Amino acid sequence: KFSRLKNQFFFFMKKKFGWEKVNNNWAAVCGGCVGMTFIYERPDLMKKISQRFLDIMYEYLNGFGDDGACAEGLDYWIYGFGYFLYFADVYREFTGGQTDLLDDEKVKYIAQFQQNMYLSGNAAISFSDSSRYAYFERGMTDYLKTYYGKEIIPPDNKFSCEKPACSRFAHFIRSYLWRDEYKAYNQDDDFIFYPDAQWYIRKLNSFGFAAKGGNNGESHNHNDIGSFIIAYEGKQIFADIGAGEYTSDYFSENRYKYLCTSSLGHSVPIINGYAQKDGIEYNAEIIKADKDEFCLDISGAYGIEEVRAVIRKFEIMSDTVILTDEFKIEGERCNIIERFISVINPEYI
């Protein structure tokens, strides 16, 4: 058994892997796991190739804008940033404190991402391949609170995850080793805007609201430019379905035939019979983003020549959201279907 493991270390040193050059969670997960294995099992070899693992971690961080938003969604923040954190902790100890990957302004902003994703109770922002209801990893959250102090606001402990997804040992063991007792703070009446990701978040005493621009070529992308979520009393009222069932077909060229990834499964209009298109070139233009209003042009998501502008404006009040869509279309054809997604059956009053 040891001989087989020994051969794997030298095999790794002679070969480059695709996940070393990706700007998503996979770089941190794979690089972090392999890097920690080298530190624990072959620290002598780690001293020779440590820069390789640092480069992998920097590739991961390059997938974030300076605002710290994880365009892949909260679930992949937990996955990717979790393993980045675990590696950073072990590597800091390995270097005797000389290299601290967490001592960085951008990394601090990334660490704050989780606390901004809770809208009402554990009804969360489920953009991209994420879940409508969030359960946080207690160990990594408490560690970040200890490290960054008041900059980190832990969610309510009743929403902590006691059974890590896929039985991931790294999350599980740290939920015991790093567990601490921190008070959850109320985030009512809060406003967050991520300018790079173009995510808008408004939390009030009565409800939580989120909307997004961005582009349709993001990692774990959904065609969802202009989509929004309204959460109330712990439930998404206007919903983002979130991730679909993971199959090979879901990650193939057929991805946008699924309702949850297509714009047909999001609260955005159908214009002249067309849904939004996928690709980084299909994007939004932000017009205004402040505490009371979020306004953007989503026409670029459709790639329709005669559609000159689709100005979507959200006005946020204490107990109301007013949505106004303004269409500028050339030619005689102007067929608009407004589409709203909810998992709650409407009732006539």
Predicted region positions:
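Short, charged N-terminal helix-start/capping segments
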Residues: K1-N24, R138-F159, H222-I225, A231-Y246, ...
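Conserved structured core elements
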Residues: A28, K47-L54, A71-L74, I78-L85, ...
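A residue-level signal for conserved active-site and pocket-lining positions in enzyme catalytic cores
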Residues: V34, Q114, D325
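Carbohydrate-active enzyme catalytic cores, enriched for enzymes
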Residues: Y79-I237
